[in-house]
Amino acid sequence: MWYSNTEDVKAEYADVFYLVSTRIFHEENADGSILYVASNTPEQKAVLSKEMAFVSNNLFPDSLNFFSPFYHQLTLEAAELGSETYNRMSSDVTAEVYESFRYYMDNLNGGRPVVLAGFSQGAFLVKKLLKMMPPEDYSRVVASYSLGCGVNDDDVSTGRIIPAQGADDTGVCITFNSVSDTSAVWPLAMDKCSHCINPVNWTVGAESAEFSYDGQDLTVRLDTSANVLVVDGYKESAPGFNVPWPEGCLHRYEILFYNDYLKSNVLRRVNNFRKSL
């Protein structure tokens, strides 16, 4: 089953294939035992649809076709089991997402360029897809946006994940993670990060950039040692929910902070890619 932004596909431009973040916190059997994979009940799909609708409306230009599969995601409780266990448990989820991508490319894409994007668990799966897809599909990827999941040297060594160096390059991976301090790095999403880009000024250097969110004037800079974004000045206006990441980790804000910058950048890269066809 799919979430899409239009019944009338715009055949002449480009698509977005988006993988939603971890939205299901807890799942259990009838006997009360914990399940670590969501069942995709109607109620759960309604929760996933909220993020899909938000990113379709706020993160991507209206001129792009938007497709997002309802995959059986790992729950947030699975993230508390540690990186090794989480990676092992993700194999079935990865296989399902690849099958969805294969169906999309064979039946829905129509030969158009595609922007591959995901947030959090979705970003983790974006990296998996890039490594798995055949060359003919890879050649049609405008860029990939792995938001809230770091890229490390092992990823880059595959030759399929090429870190973005600016605002205009295509065939690259845009990746970043935000914290208030480098002590707040969340190992599951940010461990061994070797690449990062600042989505406000689109540089891979340490130059600071100013932006606003929730009525607050903020500054963001890339810490080139930890390869994460350090956001100065943000004060949460509402309490957060119970999460397994360190205090000061701004993981939940990756899309909220930067959606305007990302939206214009997606269109910029699509236009550049189409010029090269």
Across the structure, where does each feature detected by a protein language model lie?
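Surface cap/lid and interfacial helix-loop subdomains adjacent to catalytic sites
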Residues: A95-G110, K131-L277
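Bimodal feature
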Residues: D8-K10, S56, V114-V115, L129, ...
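Extracytoplasmic/secreted cell-surface and envelope-processing proteins
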Residues: E27-E28, E77-A78, F124-K127, D153-S157
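Structural recognition of the beta-strand scaffold that forms the well-ordered cores
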Residues: D15-L19, N65-F70, V115-L116, A143-S146, ...
